[in-house]
Curated annotation (Swiss-Prot):
Protein name (Swiss-Prot/TrEMBL): Large ribosomal subunit protein bL20
Function: Binds directly to 23S ribosomal RNA and is necessary for the in vitro assembly process of the 50S ribosomal subunit. It is not involved in the protein synthesizing functions of that subunit.
Annotated family: Belongs to the bacterial ribosomal protein bL20 family.
Name of the gene: rplT
PANTHER family xrefs: 39S RIBOSOMAL PROTEIN L20 (PTHR10986)
A Pfam match: Ribosomal_L20
Keyword RNA-binding set for record: yes
CDD domains named in the record: Ribosomal_L20
Keywords: Ribonucleoprotein, Ribosomal protein, RNA-binding, rRNA-binding
Molecular function terms, GO-annotated: rRNA binding; structural constituent of ribosome
Tree of life domain: Bacteria
Single Gene Ontology BP annotation: translation
Length: 125
């Protein structure tokens, strides 16, 4: 009986890992034992950073909204509170885009938020 080596399977497995390691420096892309560690670590970073990306973009949007709102005389929290009271349901991504690309439209939203805050303040008094 001939010896079974699994050569085809092993070659395919090595090729898959080395293809994923393409572009790594030095032996990290050519040595299978090293490449498998680097590829695993790279996949861990990718998994982690797909989640971090969401947090980073949300904080970027909040910074942009805050800057746009402060130009109009409101803080971020006052602006968001005013939008909620006015019944305007725009997410932070859209608001940040408006603040950067359409300052006039964003200014009208700030005006509506201010008006909603003023009416609730009058009702409370």
């Amino acid at each position: 009986m001939s010896r079974a080596t699994n050569a085809k399977t092993n070659h395919a497995r090595h090729k898959k890992v080395l293809d994923l390691a393409k572009g790594y420096r030095g032996r990290n892309s050519t040595n299978f034992r090293i490449a498998i560690e680097k590829v695993e670590k790279g996949l861990q970073y990718a998994y982690r950073d797909r989640r971090a990306k969401k947090r980073n973009f949300r904080s970027l949007w909040i910074q942009r909204i805050n800057a746009g709102a402060r130009e109009q005389g409101l803080t971020y929290s006052q602006f968001i509170n005013g939008l909620i009271r006015a019944g305007i349901e725009l997410d932070r991504k859209i608001l940040a885009d408006l603040a950067v690309t359409e300052p006039a439209a964003f200014a009208s939203l700030v005006a509506q938020a201010k008006a909603a805050l003023d009416t609730t303040a009058e009702q409370a008094a």
